[in-house]
């Protein structure tokens, strides 16, 4: 619950009151409030990592869930106004990116839907999945991945920090262009990662809606949410065990491993 307390303190500093009170345990009053004013928030971007068919995506969400869909933009709106809207949303939809840290302001029981561009494996980039599933957050996480290369728009001539690869050797450029899955790497200057994460995406609406439908089937009700969930660290990698005999009567055993991915 520490993160929720932190979010609450930040909101108080910004003079923000939560739009929809979904914090309480289950009950008919809460259900009535949700039905009256539920809405979905979609993060809109105007420079990079665009959702090319954003309007179509918004319409699909509205039709599927029969509730209002609003967009927010950190490029065009103040941070407090964005937080105000997110704090009352039942779902937050966004391309992978730092703006998803605002999911910590979502009310309990809300869903986080993270979109990933082509060749970017959701299983390898899990900070926001981890945040959503921390004890006390009580958020439902769903990811969608673009698997159709024809639905992506790349920008090889941009500056390297925005995914450009024109500065690389021809052999390396060709390898990146031919790759269908970004290999594991350390954040955040890997050129293949930057090239792929800064793509624009034409979201395949049928597959997106199907992923949402399947994902929402496993969404627990507020009555079933418990704050006793467990957090599992990432798999232990490159474990090493060393022994050091100092004297006939004294020895040391040292175990080390790589920092976990999450």
Task: Describe the residue ranges of each PLM region.
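The feature primarily captures lumenal catalytic ectodomains
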Residues: 1-260
């Amino acid at each position: 619950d520490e993160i929720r307390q932190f979010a609450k303190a930040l909101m108080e500093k910004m003079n923000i009151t939560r739009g929809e009170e979904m914090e309480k345990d289950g009950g008919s009053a809460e259900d009535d409030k949700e039905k009256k004013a539920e809405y979905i928030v979609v993060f809109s971007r105007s420079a990079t990592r665009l959702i090319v068919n954003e309007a179509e995506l918004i319409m699909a969400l509205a039709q599927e869930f029969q509730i209002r869909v609003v967009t927010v933009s950190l490029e065009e709106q103040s941070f407090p106004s964005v937080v105000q809207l997110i704090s009352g949303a039942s779902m937050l939809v966004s391309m992978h990116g730092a703006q998803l840290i605002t999911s910590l302001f979502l009310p309990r029981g809300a869903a986080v839907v993270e979109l990933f561009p082509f060749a970017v494996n959701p299983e390898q980039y899990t900070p926001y999945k981890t945040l959503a599933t921390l004890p006390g957050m009580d958020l439902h996480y769903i990811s969608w991945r673009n698997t159709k290369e024809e639905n992506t728009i790349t920008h090889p001539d941009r500056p390297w920090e925005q995914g450009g690869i024109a500065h690389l050797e021809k052999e390396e450029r060709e390898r990146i262009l031919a790759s269908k899955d970004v290999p594991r790497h350390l954040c955040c200057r890997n050129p293949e990662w930057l090239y792929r994460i800064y793509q624009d995406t034409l979201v395949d609406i049928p597959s997106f809606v199907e992923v949402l439908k399947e994902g929402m089937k496993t969404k627990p009700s507020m009555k079933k949410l418990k704050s006793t969930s467990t957090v599992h660290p990432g798999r232990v990698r490159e474990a090493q065990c060393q022994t050091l005999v100092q004297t006939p009567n004294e020895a040391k055993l040292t175990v080390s491993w790589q920092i976990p991915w999450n």
